[in-house]
Amino acid sequence: MNLGDMYNSGFEFALTGHLVNRNDFKWDMTLQASTFKNEITSLPDPFINGSKRWVEGRSRFDFFLLRTAGVDPETGDQLFLLYEQNEDGESVPVIDETTGEIATTNDWEETERAYTGDSSIPDLLGSVSNSFSYK
């Protein structure tokens, strides 16, 4: 059963060169590169799948995680940036009124996950392969 729609795009490029082409020895090299983009275009309701949140307008490969703020130097506890959900269900930072920075907490259950701005899709994927033959 399909729950939604997504749009995928990208390109793939390959270039092969015959570097040495003699009767008894041949050497070929191939360079390959590709890109890939993904966007969810239709989905009835957003949902979380592991470290990803699937929602219209985002990629299904965007990381949706608890944001860390390092370690509390006084206690050694891990600190998390404090986020809350707005009325649209989006994670927004909670601003500390005294510092003007995003508030922190050492209790991961007090915060919400947020998009990190990172994706599990690399910007560019590539490879180099060589082929040698003798006689």
Regions found by a protein language model. Name each.
Residues 13-17, 128-134:
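Residues on the lipid-exposed face of transmembrane beta-strands in outer-membrane beta-barrel proteins
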Residues 40, 126-128:
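Residue-level marker for the onset of beta-strands and adjacent loop->beta junctions
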